[in-house]
Amino acid sequence: MKRVVITGFGIISSIGNNKKEVLNSLYNGISGITFSEEMKESGMRSQVWGNIKLENKKFFKKNKISRFMNNGSIYAFLSMEQAIKDANLQTKQYQKNPRIGIIAGSGGGFPKYHIQGIDAIRSNRGLNSVSPYIAIKAMNSGISACLSTLFKIYGVNYSISSACATSGHCIGNAFELIKFGKQDLIFAGGGEEVSWELAYEFDAMKALSSNFNKNPTKSSRVYDVNRDGFVISGGGGIIVIEELNCALSRSAHIYAEIIGYAATSDGKDMVVPSGDGAVRCMNLAKKQNKMLFIDYLNVHGTSTKIGDLIELEAIKKSFFHEKKPMISATKSMTGHALGVSGVHEIIYTLLMMKYNFIAPSINIETIEPSADNMNIVQKTFHKKIKTALSNSFGFGGTNVSLILKKY
């Protein structure tokens, strides 16, 4: 079986729109959460989000394909441009090559376009008032469809949609395809737009934070006793996953090797995690490398009352006979980017591995008793990270664990 490495990445997020900006935010514990006037005007309880701040959108007119692109696709497109440059890939190396593919998706979908179409029909303006591009803009697979067309990808081309584990599954699936020799290189990740049309669905569940609307940067507070729900976010992220010999043959810089991947199902509840599924997932990922010590664990931790505690208990069980790793929750800075959070957190972890630090879990004023003595990093901690594990979980009991080793 082949060895699989990461040779580049690109990111659009609430804490920065490139490697340099994101690194600065991570290292200094800077929150990307802001007040949302749109959520307030929509009558929502939660009025904070991790919005994306882009100064210009000239790229939107780059190609006729842009008519089919939603904001999530645009964020993923910008991320892929960065990733190609970061991986030092030349056009002739990835275009029209059947050994190079893309797997990228969205967890939340794009309901704003469904709403636009329905509003047009209900206003009696007729079917002719509905944009013919809505069907593509609204579908979850629009991201991989648009990117594969724009970048002339000839290999695999599809989206995975598994709630907040989406881009984690995209990465894991890409890893396995390369490991078993079916592809040489895959662009993996996803995109998620930030909109009240998506946020209200979670606000209706009372899953979002609402107690810190007047102090947005304090609203995402994983492991603090006063946490009251997650903060919705979004963005784009693409990583370049490559077969080791392929990467070496072109003298590529290698950030890390993917040495473990597992995906499991709770099979228990639609919204409340079982914990057992997470334990099995981490154990299966670790089982692929015996005598492996994990230096750092980037938790799924979203700032919900129940979910954070269940994941902590799962970590305790999974590492019961091992030394517990250092832990931090980057969503305390970024908010929850839903389907793109998995690839975002792999990128955050890659930056920490490269620059020898662990980003803090911010906003912990009074730590949850169950989180005490769990090696949770609350201030930037300087440490060489050789191996790291990242968790992504989603509604319906879907779980992903990925393990990276510094190359």
Curated annotation (Swiss-Prot):
Its EC number is 2.3.1.41. GO terms for molecular function: 3-oxoacyl-[acyl-carrier-protein] synthase activity. It catalyses: a fatty acyl-[ACP] + malonyl-[ACP] + H(+) = a 3-oxoacyl-[ACP] + holo-[ACP] + CO2; (3Z)-decenoyl-[ACP] + malonyl-[ACP] + H(+) = 3-oxo-(5Z)-dodecenoyl-[ACP] + holo-[ACP] + CO2. Disulfide bonds: none annotated. Residues 1-406 form the Ketosynthase family 3 (KS3) domain. Pfam families: ketoacyl-synt, Ketoacyl-synt_C. GO terms for cellular component: cytosol. The active site is at C164, H300, H336. The keyword tRNA processing does not apply. Gene3D superfamilies: 3.40.47.10. One of its GO terms (biological process) is fatty acid biosynthetic process. Keywords: Acyltransferase, Cytoplasm, Fatty acid biosynthesis, Fatty acid metabolism, Lipid biosynthesis, Lipid metabolism, Transferase. It is an enzyme of class 2 (transferase). It is found in: Cytoplasm. Pathway: Lipid metabolism; fatty acid biosynthesis. The keyword Acyltransferase applies. PROSITE patterns: KS3_1, KS3_2. Belongs to the thiolase-like superfamily. Beta-ketoacyl-ACP synthases family. Involved in the type II fatty acid elongation cycle. Catalyzes the elongation of a wide range of acyl-ACP by the addition of two carbons from malonyl-ACP to an acyl acceptor. Can also use unsaturated fatty acids. Catalyzes a key reaction in unsaturated fatty acid (UFA) synthesis, the elongation of the cis-3-decenoyl-ACP produced by FabA. Homodimer. PANTHER family: 3-OXOACYL-[ACYL-CARRIER-PROTEIN] SYNTHASE 1, POLYKETIDE SYNTHASE-RELATED. This is 3-oxoacyl-[acyl-carrier-protein] synthase 1.
